[in-house]
Design a protein with these regions (language model features):
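Basic, Lys/Arg-enriched alpha-helical interface segments
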Residues: 1-37, 46-50, 57-90
C-alpha cells in the first residue's frame, strides 16, 4: 500500500511526465500506474487532474483488454455525470 501511495503522490506532483517505469500510456485517454504487480488504470486531464478508473493485479505480460475496456466505460460514465453536473450547476 505504501508503494501505491508513493506512486500516486509522484503522479500528483509531476503528472504524466514521470514516465516509465512508473506509468505507461495504454491507448486513447487511458494510462497505467505500475506499482509492483498492482495496476491502476487512470485518465489524466490537462489541468493536472486525474481520475482512477480501475484497479487490478496484473498476472500476464500484457494488460488485459477487458481491463482497458472497463476503464473506458468508467471514464465515459464519469464524463457523462460531470457534464450533467456542470449543466445543473451553471
Amino acid at each position: 500500500l505504501s508503494k501505491i501511495t508513493a506512486y500516486l503522490n509522484m503522479l500528483t506532483k509531476r503528472g504524466c511526465d514521470i514516465g516509465e517505469p512508473y506509468i505507461k500510456h495504454l491507448e486513447d485517454e487511458i494510462w497505467e500506474l505500475r506499482p509492483l504487480r498492482d495496476r491502476i488504470l487512470f485518465a489524466y486531464f490537462d489541468n493536472n487532474e486525474f481520475i482512477l478508473l480501475s484497479v487490478f493485479m496484473k498476472k500476464t505480460q500484457k494488460t488485459p483488454k477487458s481491463e482497458i475496456q472497463k476503464a473506458k466505460r468508467n471514464l465515459k460514465n464519469y464524463m457523462d455525470r460531470r457534464r450533467e453536473y456542470e449543466k445543473q450547476t451553471f
